[in-house]
């Protein structure tokens, strides 16, 4: 779709087919982040001292998913679950810190006691979506920084 020289971008190439150094612990969230970055054709290195002169270093400072349940009525049965996702990251090159940012997102799940397996599957999908949105946030800030320069 385009009009007057403006067009919508399908996706960003900021984190596509690059050599990336990712500094983080080995939590499930960080391992999923690595998996999604690899799926975009990136080579992921986990050591700081890797020869990556022009490459990007991603330092995950904080990566967390919190789950909360909401209940209403006299029986106080859980009717809804809330998932809060937070990733705090620093993007840098060997020479300088480019970006420090915290990305947060919240999603809600309807709770159905009779279909817990379905809810678990839906939660796994939401986690993948949270991480994908976190990567898009990184790409957005990298593109913004490139446009400033």
Identify the residue ranges that each predicted region occupies.
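Short acidic low-complexity segments
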Residues: 43-54
């Amino acid at each position: 779709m385009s009009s007057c020289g403006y067009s919508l971008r399908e996706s960003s190439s900021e984190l596509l087919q690059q050599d990336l150094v990712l500094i983080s612990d080995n939590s499930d969230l960080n391992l999923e982040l690595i998996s999604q970055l690899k799926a975009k054709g990136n080579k992921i290195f986990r050591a700081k001292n890797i020869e990556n002169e022009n490459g990007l270093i991603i330092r995950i400072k904080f990566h967390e998913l919190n789950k909360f349940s909401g209940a209403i009525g006299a029986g106080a049965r859980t009717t809804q679950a809330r998932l809060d996702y937070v990733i705090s990251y620093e993007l840098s090159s060997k020479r300088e810190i480019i970006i420090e940012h915290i990305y947060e997102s919240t999603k809600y799940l309807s709770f159905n006691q009779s279909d817990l397996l379905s809810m678990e599957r839906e939660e796994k999908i939401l986690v993948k979506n949270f991480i994908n949105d976190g990567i898009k946030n990184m790409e957005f800030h990298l593109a913004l920084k490139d446009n400033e320069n």
